[in-house]
């Protein structure tokens, strides 16, 4: 949100990492009452008009005696859609909508998609060596620091990362954002673990108290469930399709928990399964400039063919990755 008065920007704000307060509230709270009066506030999405974790933004705008509200697109949330426009107009506030709508539609692509189908927008990510290996047997990073940084930025834009217990037991990943300034934007984590076989010393298990973590399971013992709860893990029983956890069920659950997009970082088996069932909306494939050779593990030679078969558009980016390559499928 940007607030302008007498042709000068007097305040701005963005939605907090937790989703609340909204951008409007964060921009308005920086100003004194007299500064807010007769100003114009620019926002991308129609201000909310319902009570949730915080009061409605329209009430805040009205109380601030804002003269004019400019926003890009109506919110698809039925609690707000079109209602805020009417409320603001009825309070004699000038309202202009559809401002730079084309750009806003791109920004809110994931959000609108999730609202329409009640499931998150699904991204996938893999990093492979030049000779198509997923892992180095010596546990060295496959890609360079530039690629790793881009991957962390990608995580910062995601609500929840989906992974498997096999990936955790093998690699013990952190799945957070480890770039200065983005630490607070680490996504939630969802672990797929049908029989609850996750290692008790894993980082994710022992860090759940600091970052919301779900574990989807099917077969269990009370002892295992109690252990998960003691670690602040949220266990969720999932039905099976064949011998696998029902991924549609998992997506719907994650959407109900407020996740509008997810990123799958789950290795060869999960990625192939979801590709075969066309679950991905977009996919990022990082390709290292290095060959691993005899130290390589988990070869995925047909991955580029499988991705090309699933997606219509491909964008190759090497600009900021030194000798590595990033292929974006969408």
Predicted regions located by residue number:
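Active-site and channel-lining beta-strand-loop segments
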Residues: 1-15, 123-130, 134
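Zn2+-dependent cytidine deaminase-like catalytic core
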Residues: 3-103, 188, 275
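A short, flexible N-terminal coil/short beta segment enriched in small residues
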Residues: 7-13, 103-113, 204-208
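Enzymes that bind and transform nitrogen-containing heteroaromatic metabolites
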Residues: 35, 114, 121-330
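Short, well-ordered, mixed-charge alpha-helical segments that flank or form enzyme active sites
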Residues: 50-52, 77-81, 103-107, 130-135, ...
């Amino acid at each position: 949100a940007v607030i302008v008065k007498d042709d000068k920007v007097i305040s701005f704000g963005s939605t907090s990492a937790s989703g609340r307060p909204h951008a409007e509230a964060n921009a308005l709270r920086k100003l004194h009452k007299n500064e807010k009066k007769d100003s114009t506030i620019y926002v991308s999405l129609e201000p909310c008009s319902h009570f949730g974790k915080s009061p409605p933004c329209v009430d805040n705008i009205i109380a601030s005696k804002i003269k004019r509200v400019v926003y890009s697109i109506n919110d698809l949330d039925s609690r707000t859609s079109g209602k805020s426009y009417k409320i603001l107009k009825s309070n004699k506030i000038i309202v202009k909508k559809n401002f730079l709508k084309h750009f806003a539609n791109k920004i809110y692509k994931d959000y609108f998609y999730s609202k329409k189908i009640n499931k998150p927008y699904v991204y996938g990510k893999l990093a492979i060596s030049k000779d198509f290996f997923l892992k180095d047997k010596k546990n060295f990073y496959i890609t360079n620091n530039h690629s790793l940084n881009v991957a962390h930025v990608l995580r910062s834009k995601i609500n929840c990362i989906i992974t498997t217990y096999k990936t955790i037991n093998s690699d013990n990943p952190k799945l957070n954002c480890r770039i200065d300034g983005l630490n607070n934007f680490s996504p939630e984590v969802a672990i797929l673990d049908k029989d609850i076989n996750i290692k008790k010393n894993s980082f994710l298990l022992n860090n759940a108290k600091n970052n919301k973590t779900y574990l989807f399971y099917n077969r269990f013992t009370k002892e295992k469930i109690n252990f998960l709860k003691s670690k602040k893990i949220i266990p969720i029983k999932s039905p099976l399709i064949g011998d696998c956890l029902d991924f549609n069920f998992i997506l719907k659950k994650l959407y109900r928990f407020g996740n509008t997009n997810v990123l799958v970082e789950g290795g060869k088996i999960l990625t192939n399964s979801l590709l075969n069932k066309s679950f991905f909306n977009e996919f990022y494939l990082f390709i290292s400039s290095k060959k691993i050779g005899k130290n390589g593990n988990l070869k995925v030679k047909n991955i580029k063919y499988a991705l090309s078969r699933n997606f219509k558009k491909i964008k190759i980016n090497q600009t900021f990755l030194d000798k590595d390559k990033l292929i974006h499928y969408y």
